[in-house]
């Protein structure tokens, strides 16, 4: 499906200091979801998905509970969703999603990462027509009939399904996230990660040498504590 953040998955996970950097990012996602939609997972599909993603990455229950508790506290940090658009080397397009309690720090860091690694930050909205926002669910492989599964999910906003050797990926319109999430849960599918992702409308292929240049920027972005997701138009 040409989505970034999934491409180079194995090498990226090896780079990402695994738990030391991943857990704070997962906790931040839980905290934001809980603050936006309430602390009851049964009534908040985004929180359910954030918790499921954390569990799939072996985040301890105590950490998950603490993140939810922070969201309901009177003195909880005001964490904002921040979105940046830019270009990497060789014209690769990049969308960066952050969660931060200090936007001034975050924008300075993101701009510095782009400028020091052959890229540039663009005005927000510049890449809107190049990507489509989708509700995307990454699940354990499904052993049943995929065509039957599609029929069962179509009324919930299902649009596309793809299964490879590692996982099943289901996507739909971003406005159908809650309904599609409930339908997937009802089917008993095992969730690994879910959220709203930016899918490139026209993925572009790059040579190995070009990808090496582009990855220098992507690596630095993914290592930043405030960055939650990075999407590109790389095929």
From Swiss-Prot:
InterPro entries linked: Integrase-like_N, TACO1_YebC-like_2nd/3rd_dom, TACO1_YebC_N, Transcrip_reg_TACO1-like, Transcrip_reg_TACO1-like_dom3, YebC-like
Entry GO CC: cytosol
Source species, domain of life: Bacteria
Keyword Transcription regulation annotated: yes
Gene Ontology terms describing biological process: regulation of DNA-templated transcription
GO molecular function: DNA binding
Keywords: Cytoplasm, DNA-binding, Transcription, Transcription regulation
Location relative to the cell: Cytoplasm
NCBIfam families: PRK12378.1, YebC/PmpR family DNA-binding transcriptional regulator
Protein family: Belongs to the TACO1 family.
HAMAP family referenced in this protein's UniProt entry, alphabetically: Transcrip_reg_TACO1
Record-given protein name: Probable transcriptional regulatory protein JJD26997_0557
